[in-house]
């Protein structure tokens, strides 16, 4: 069946409902393709004769990147492409074809989800020498010490785990918004339906900037967001999953309400971390509540409190994106700029200061006892069994100086750091005075 080539509301609604690269025409794939540093990295690998293994989760964009490289002008004529090895039932057939391509020194890209790749390695690594390289690189994607990290610049195979890619960066978010509002056949000046209205709003620079800020904040969380999640979210914000634009739409079809009503990873993140009732600001909340009261204009405020509250929530959602137009004298980022700030600063800074280390030791010590003064050493606590029975009592007799610890930040292996942006989901406290390092992963919940 020939795919529908249209780029109108039907196409965007299909994106909102999960239709992606495998079922799109070439024109549609090109229209929504978000160019990132990964495009250039893949091009360089192919042009230098390497094979790339793209792995990760469903929706990470593996198939899309292969299809775009295939149609690229100047792509190697003899390149070997396998858009979805995960769908193959016979791994041996895949591996034999792959080995043949390697033996003939053909460049190429193979896409396979992370689970099937581990299964392939478990079952067949001993039978194919090149799978040793794949396994080593898969285990070395993230490193703590660049100086001692294994390098694979000279390998004929390059493994990229897109599970580590941050797709909520400003450049990617802006491209995604612009692709879905300017590269599609939806003209806000031709109709006044909900789709055209939402497209016009998302073409506004202030709205785009606030989307980028919120995405950037959400991108620092532990939850992995795929490129499919991002496009699905934005397409739903524009259409509500409807292919036909509804004239004179109600509030439920405004983009700032649709951002909270869809299904998927980004919608869950919005509901959990960008809840208007959780992100409070005394002056903003007061002014928006007063505005809600005026718009509802009840005779009895107490009787209309639920209606006023509903209107207030909608105004608060609108303010998150249209703060300048609403002219309250405050920026919407003042509502969420300090969410988990201390942990994010510890996790994302390139190098740990002595102050960071002391603060972290104080927090860990505080798990067992008052730690306001315990910043220069880590107390070691023990529990004992008496006559074979456990006791709830714990005691400390030893401590370790802070000079024996370092804070490490996970980073991409230097061999692939040019392929994508990575934001770690934790920091690491490392004991460095022993023959082998002992590490404690410091997650948001532990911190």
Regions found by a protein language model. Name each.
Residues 1-10:
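Interdomain "pre-motor" coupling segment immediately N-terminal to P-loop NTPase/helicase cores
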Residues 10-46:
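N-terminal pre-Walker A segment at the start of P-loop NTPase domains
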Residues 45-66:
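Walker A/P-loop nucleotide-binding motif
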Residues 66-73:
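A conserved segment at the C-terminal end of the G1
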Residues 75-125:
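Conserved nucleotide-sensing/catalytic segment adjacent to the nucleotide-binding pocket
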Residues 181-431:
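Extended alpha-helical coiled-coil/bundle linker/stalk regions that scaffold oligomerization
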């Amino acid at each position: 069946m020939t795919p529908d080539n249209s780029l109108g509301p039907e196409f965007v609604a299909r994106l909102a409902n999960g239709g992606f690269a495998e079922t799109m025409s070439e024109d549609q794939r090109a229209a929504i393709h978000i160019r990132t540093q990964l495009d250039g990295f893949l091009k360089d690998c192919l042009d230098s004769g390497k094979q790339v293994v793209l792995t990760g989760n469903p929706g990470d964009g593996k198939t899309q990147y292969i299809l775009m490289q295939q149609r690229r002008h100047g792509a190697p004529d003899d390149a070997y492409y396998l858009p979805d090895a995960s769908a193959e039932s016979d791994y041996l057939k895949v591996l034999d074809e792959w080995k043949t391509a390697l033996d003939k020194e053909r460049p190429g890209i193979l896409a396979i989800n992370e689970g099937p790749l581990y299964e392939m390695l478990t079952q067949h690594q001993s039978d194919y020498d090149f799978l040793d390289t794949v396994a080593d690189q898969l285990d070395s994607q993230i490193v703590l010490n660049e100086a001692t990290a294994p390098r694979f610049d000279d390998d004929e195979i390059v493994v990229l785990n897109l599970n580590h890619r941050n797709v909520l960066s400003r450049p990617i978010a802006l491209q995604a918004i612009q692709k879905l509002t300017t590269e599609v056949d939806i003209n806000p000046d031709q109709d006044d339906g909900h789709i055209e209205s939402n497209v016009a709003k998302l073409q506004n620079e202030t709205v785009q900037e606030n989307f980028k800020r919120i995405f950037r904040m959400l991108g620092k969380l532990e939850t992995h967001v795929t490129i499919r999640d991002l496009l699905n979210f934005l397409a739903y914000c524009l259409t509500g999953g409807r292919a036909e634009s509804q004239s004179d739409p109600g509030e439920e079809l405004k983009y700032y309400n649709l951002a909270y009503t869809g299904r998927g990873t980004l919608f869950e993140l919005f509901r959990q971390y960008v809840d208007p009732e959780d992100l409070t600001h005394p002056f903003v909340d007061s002014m928006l509540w007063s505005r809600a009261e005026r718009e509802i204009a009840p005779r009895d405020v107490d009787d209309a409190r639920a209606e006023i509250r509903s209107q207030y929530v909608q105004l608060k959602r609108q303010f998150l994106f249209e703060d300048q137009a609403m002219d309250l004298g405050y920026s919407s980022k003042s509502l969420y700029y300090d969410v988990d700030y201390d942990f994010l600063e510890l996790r994302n800074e390139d190098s740990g200061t002595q102050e960071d280390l002391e603060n972290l030791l104080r927090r860990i010590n505080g798990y067992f006892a008052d730690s306001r003064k315990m910043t220069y050493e880590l107390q070691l606590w023990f529990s004992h069994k008496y006559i074979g029975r456990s006791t709830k009592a714990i005691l400390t007799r030893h401590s370790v100086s802070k000079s024996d610890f370092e804070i490490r930040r996970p980073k991409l292996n230097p061999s692939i750091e040019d392929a994508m942006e990575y934001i770690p989901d934790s920091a690491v406290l490392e004991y460095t005075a022993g023959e082998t390092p002992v590490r404690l992963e410091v997650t948001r919940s532990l911190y």
